[in-house]
Swiss-Prot record:
It comes from the Bacteria. Produces ATP from ADP in the presence of a proton gradient across the membrane. This is V-type proton ATPase subunit E. GO terms for molecular function: ATP binding; proton-transporting ATP synthase activity, rotational mechanism; proton-transporting ATPase activity, rotational mechanism. It comes from Clostridium botulinum (strain Kyoto / Type A2).
Amino acid sequence: MSNLENLTSKIIEDANKEAEKLLSEAKKEENKIVNEKVKKGEKVKEQIIEKSKGEAKTKAERVISNTQLKVRNNKLEAKQEMINKVFDEAVIKLQNLPQEEYLNFIKNSILSLDIEGDEEIIVSPNDKNKIDISFILTLNNKLKAKGKKDLLKISNENRNIKGGFILYKNGIEINNSFEALVDSLRDELEQEIIEALFS
């Protein structure tokens, strides 16, 4: 569990750094959009006043209101894009873990699960060569020492995941892919990221 806490802490720290950068870019874009829309709104307003002062005020207010609504929607979209980017970056950082860290992560994650010890480990085609027989033997020895079966093996099946693993047995899967782990933390971390990005 401490491995997951360290991972969570690292994701939050990286997210905060990425958030500052993304927020700066988003604010520049927001100012640009607002300035352009306000100028356009003012121009439309002046043209309308020429034709009819009574209608001009109503139309100008409508243009400004629509512009404000568009800006608000654009800001919401930009915020969601930035949040998604932070989580995507977290998955990429996990994918780029050094081999030893990656194998330790897999080992510690499997050993922390309540499993019987005779499951199959499904990984991505890219990760298949990272897990060798000696790693599986070590893992099985540790499972045996915990009173579990020592029959864990690498599956012949591959999955299109970005890293991590899926444990499979009798039609039941435990998804510990990097995407699933980051998604499982999303609800917990999203509010912290929003506060870091937009407060």
